[in-house]
Amino acid sequence: FQGGNARAVTLAVFGNRDFDDALLELNDAAAAAGFKVIASAAPIAEHSMVRSVGAGRPDAQDQKELAAFAGQVLAKLEKGDDSTPEVPGNRPYKESENKPWAPVVSEACIKCGRCAAECPVGAIPADAPNTTDANRCIHCMRCTVVCPENARSLAAPMTQMLTGFLGKVAGGRHDNCFFL
């Protein structure tokens, strides 16, 4: 799709760890598609893989901060300020590590297809929703959230590894990040 020089606000939600180069990459992609990025945000949410990290986020304080940011964006628009904010990140971008794994599916799967319908990259075939193409999976964990039978989850060794890693780097309350 093409932006036609439309103004845009970019968001990269992160799970109380770090958003790394996500906003920089997103802003570059938006600009390449013809959008004029005028603001960016990296709000905190519950981590998609280890839900105890960032649990309860966004909360009331986050909602107030997001509302204030929206007001600042509106004020920027009303002033006619189309400047693009500087966001953290590195060029060249980090190389993506090919991690061909995906959530596991238990016998509880009733093949309702909700996970396939909700998968943003089509890694779960509609005709075989009890399978996942690990090479296409982006590990967003949407399928685990929408499964009515809780039949999809991370494999236990992966959960243990991530819990150990994230416990070291994601403790405490991290701040939302806003860029105007």
Predicted feature locations:
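Iron-sulfur cluster-binding cysteine motifs and their immediate structural context
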Residues: 105, 110, 114-138, 142-159
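Short, charged low-complexity linear segments at domain edges
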Residues: 81-101, 111-126
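Solvent-exposed, well-ordered amphipathic alpha-helical segments
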Residues: 4-6, 29-38, 77, 101-108, ...
